[in-house]
Amino acid sequence: MEPNSPKKIQFAVPVFQSQIAPEAAEQIRKRRPTPASLVILNEHNPPEIDDKRVPNTQGELQNASPKQRKQSVYTPPTIKGVKHLKGQNESAFPEEEEGTNEREEQRDH
């Protein structure tokens, strides 16, 4: 370090030590399944195990693979439904109505 340069603070960083024993950490790692192993296990389940299975809870559904989740299909609103909603909310969008009235007047000219 040069004599005229500002002094830099150096911190002594202790070596990271896990709060649990390495053996315990290894046991936890072995017990905890990875997403890939879950998919492999689910593909190779014998049928009799599937019959005894309890319905999934909400938490289990979030962890399920995309194939196992119920696929929802987007249904766009119909023209009839949009017109019905717009008819109900006409007072809710006054600026939108003004814009349509102005466009209609321009078409008439």
From Swiss-Prot:
Cellular localisation: Cytoplasm
Compositionally biased tracts (Basic and acidic residues): 45-54, 100-109
Quick one: where is this thing mainly located? Answer: cytoplasm
Annotated GO molecular function terms are: protein phosphatase inhibitor activity
Disordered as annotated region, ranges:
25-109
Q: Name one GO biological process term.
A: intracellular signal transduction
Quote the Pfam families the UniProt record gives.
DARPP-32
PANTHER family hit by this protein: PROTEIN PHOSPHATASE 1 REGULATORY SUBUNIT 1C (PTHR15417:SF5), PROTEIN PHOSPHATASE INHIBITOR AND DOPAMINE- AND CAMP-REGULATED NEURONAL PHOSPHOPROTEIN (PTHR15417)
Q: Which family does it belong to?
A: Belongs to the protein phosphatase inhibitor 1 family.
What does the UniProt function comment say about this protein? May increase cell susceptibility to TNF-induced apoptosis.
Name it: Protein phosphatase 1 regulatory subunit 1C
Q: Which organism is it from?
A: Pongo abelii
